[in-house]
Amino acid sequence: MTKKYLNTQNEISAFWNTQKIFKKSIDNRKGQESFVFYDGPPTANGLPHAGHVLGRVIKDLVARLKTMQGFYVERKAGWDTHGLPVELEVEKKIGIKGKQDIEKYGIENFINECKKSVFNYEKEWRDFSKDLGYWVDMDSPYITLENNYIESVWNILSTFHKKGLLYKGHKVTPYCTHDQTALSSHEVAQGYKNVKDLSAVVKFQLTNSKDTYFLSWTTTPWTLPANVALAINKDLNYSKIRVENEYYILATDLINSIITEKYEIIDTFSGSNLINLKYIPPFESDGLVNAYYVVDGEFVTNSEGTGIVHIAPAHGEDDYQLVLERDLDFLNVITREGVYNDRFPELVGNKAKNSDIEIIKLLSKKQLLYKKQKYEHNYPHCWRCGNPLIYYAMEGWFIKTTNFKNEIINNNNNIEWFPSHIKEGRMGNFLENMVDWNIGRNRYWGTPLNVWICNDCNHEYAPSSIKDLQNNSINKIDEDIELHRPYVDNITLSCPKCNGKMSRVEEVIDVWFDSGSMPFAQHHYPFDNQKIFNQHFPADFIAEGVDQTRGWFYSLLVISTILKGKSSYKRALSLGHILDSNGKKMSKSKGNVINPTELINKYGADSLRWALISDSAPWNNKRFSENIVAQTKSKFIDTLDNIYKFYNMYNKIDHYNPNNEITKSRNTLDNWALSRLNTLIKESNIYVNNYDFTSAARLINEYTNTISNWYIGDSRGRFWEQGISNDKKDAYNTLYEILTTLSRLVAPFVPFISEKIHYNLTGKSVHLQDYPQYKESFINQALEDEMHTVIKIVELSRQARKNADLKIKQPLSKMVIKPNSQLNLSFLPNYYSIIKDELNIKNIELTDNINDYITYELKLNFSSVGPKLGNKTKNIQTLIDSLSEYDKKSLIESNNFKSLSSDAELTKDDFIIKTLPKDSYQLSEDNDCVILLDKNLSPELIREGHARELIRLIQQLRKKKNLPINQRIDIYIGVTGELLESIKTNKNMFKENFVIKNIHLNVIDEYENTIHFNNKEIKISLLY
């Protein structure tokens, strides 16, 4: 049966599917050492975007690489299914808004809609992953909404509760009034924005002192109605000052930063003198007994503000702790909806966070506003809905993460981070400021918090499993009960302390606890798969966006540290953001979003993958555009494909079967290409093993272009020659080795084209092969160094041709090469044939003396010699101008510039020296050598140049007519004058470049094609 060749991405995907290549790639490594990979779960109720591409590319690259390196790498997909984003999507779909509407709609109905919503785009995610070439098991994923998963999460929470680590507390927490739920510290860290808010310096009148005021600066005027105290620092100095007819008290060091008018200092004293002084609040609230006086607060500083802080315990953690310590009254004037309640009748019903202007107007009306101004600061916003958060005192459920702070930090220090600065930077800094994890959410669609509280004695119980729930339930519970609201809400347990009824708390848990539990819950641990869990914990590698230092990276680390004493991952790669071409964040509203599926359809997945990997390190933010993908396709993917097509084109003619074991060739180019290949393997392996995929990709890119531009170009004649000579066999064997090895080397990066090349050449899937290891015996560093020099000389010469406007098709009679004194070019004659072919040069002269070909221009560097010579500078320049050519050369070559002046010691740096070619030569030079090309064109050279250019044009016609290169043809040319002579003189050159029966000159009247050459028309027909 004839082997079917793979050509398109769809054909390759179909081949992988029908031949189960993904499964085979894993099964082939069974019994080998495992490399454990965790796939961070996306949510399937939104479409994949450009940021998802980078994450999936890196994960796939690592998994494929480690598999080819011999590891057993299982790849289990996951779905993150709970949380507020799902609720908001459902609200929008069914036309409701807010918690009250949800309650009216019915929690059960709402939960059912959420379950449907989470897999709205599962097909798009599957197609996207398949099209990208992302190999992951999506047929048996872990799903956070499934009972087995939730049961494992419950088991973790139950363990924490039994150890006293899960507790109910009253704390000031970040709170979203739009979503009406608290946020954890790591969620808050994801949503900071730079904003300008109104700040105010407020006057607090001292009791029994009509004209004396404390001045307090606040950036949250909307919290003033909740004021219960003023805080000072007893160790700071404060002053009483007079401004016109009023007296103000504030920190001495801050007077000049606050007071703009003329003032007089009346008295200066310690802050301790102010403690217990009473004041009249700007918005007094009835019913408070222990409030409205000055207290000491260690957190008060003289770095900004007035040194006096207004205390609102409902809206600040420091404020709340101070109130607890001093037994002050607590005042809350804001509802959970974020509006003022009737404790603040002036603005009852107004959105508090939006009321700064109204508050300032009220202060002004009461003559209690000293001044107001805009204040720019970093303010937390909800990472889900974008609304500004408030700090709000409320009851909540917390995990005592601070008890494990040192262990968590130590475990983080043992993680290998990419980039390394994340460890002590973004991640380390966040861990240093860790607070207890606020885990409860007053929402609906999530893992229910598994805590039941006795209605009679307040005893708490946290069941660890469904069986535990059944054993303690008052009513019978079905085996298949769904562990979601409202079903678990209806379960009552029997209190083990007093036999009373226990009811579940209303909260669901933070979705980050869901995803952070995946190392355990994906295996239904500890109920099942304990051995499998032990084999898959911890992960060797994870990768997600940099934001996940406050999300998944954090939750994984914290949960596993508390539960198992160690991190759940050994290595973490933190991915940068994908930005638009102007460095702006992509968003639908800006219209700058790139659709990855469209890019894949247009340019292929490999182009997109390679563009993301080779552009810059994956942890860098990337400016990205369609143009970058298009250029990548052109510069790398197409180049690699064209090398394969070149090999395939000639091999279809010769039907040569290359040796499986490559041996040393007799050809210098072959040995150089194979040496470079093995050096590439050696160096790129070092990079990929250190997760530096970008550096590896750049090396591969450079090598591929070198093979295309040099090896293919210089070996074309070897493949073209008739028959199968030993030299031709060497060329085939070498290029076959390059293609099959290179395809294995790039397979983790670009899985489609690597499969096409390797399978079509060998009949075997590249993804079932081992990753290449270098062969020391093939590395010849001296040969590589010599060819590197040859390439530099050729490139320098090409630049000279370009500067002289001499096309490469035009042969030149001679080039002269002069190395500098440090460069040894004694080896160069061995490469003359290569240089001649590359540059279309007849003769090469290697010399240490080019005096016959150049002149020197010598001028003073006036900025250097001016200070040395003063008014004698002009005399020295006159002397230089009078020197003969011979004297100039002698002076420069001897470096004896001191002889020019007895007044100052002159050196080479005091002169501007230019090397100029004589009229008939073109010069090009670098630090290593000087190149001179003879521009004189004899009639014979001109005719040969015309013939070569005409051959190029005929080759284009042949390709246009889709004539195979081995198709025997008759060439009919209608031409006169000098061009006719060019063809006649160089007829053999045509026979060397085409398989022709004959060349016929001016023998027919009508021709198929007309081409223009040197402003003349040439008629051509190709017949076969």
Curated annotation (Swiss-Prot):
HAMAP family: Ile_tRNA_synth_type2. SUPFAM superfamilies: Anticodon-binding domain of a subclass of class I aminoacyl-tRNA synthetases (SSF47323), Nucleotidylyl transferase (SSF52374), ValRS/IleRS/LeuRS editing domain (SSF50677). A motif ('KMSKS' region) lies at residues 585-589. GO terms for cellular component: cytoplasm. It is found in: Cytoplasm. GO terms for molecular function: aminoacyl-tRNA deacylase activity; ATP binding; isoleucine-tRNA ligase activity; tRNA binding; zinc ion binding. It holds the Pfam family Anticodon_1. It catalyses: tRNA(Ile) + L-isoleucine + ATP = L-isoleucyl-tRNA(Ile) + AMP + diphosphate. Monomer. It comes from Staphylococcus aureus. Catalyzes the attachment of isoleucine to tRNA(Ile). As IleRS can inadvertently accommodate and process structurally similar amino acids such as valine, to avoid such errors it has two additional distinct tRNA(Ile)-dependent editing activities. One activity is designated as 'pretransfer' editing and involves the hydrolysis of activated Val-AMP. The other activity is designated 'posttransfer' editing and involves deacylation of mischarged Val-tRNA(Ile). Its EC number is 6.1.1.5. IleRS has two distinct active sites: one for aminoacylation and one for editing. The misactivated valine is translocated from the active site to the editing site, which sterically excludes the correctly activated isoleucine. The single editing site contains two valyl binding pockets, one specific for each substrate (Val-AMP or Val-tRNA(Ile)). Its main location: cytoplasm. ATP binds at K588. This is Isoleucine--tRNA ligase. Belongs to the class-I aminoacyl-tRNA synthetase family. IleS type 2 subfamily. GO terms for biological process: isoleucyl-tRNA aminoacylation; response to antibiotic. PANTHER family: ISOLEUCINE--TRNA LIGASE, CYTOPLASMIC (PTHR42780:SF1), SOLEUCYL-TRNA SYNTHETASE (PTHR42780). The keyword Cytoplasm applies. The keyword Transmembrane does not apply. A motif ('HIGH' region) lies at residues 42-52. It comes from the Bacteria. Its cofactor is Zn(2+).
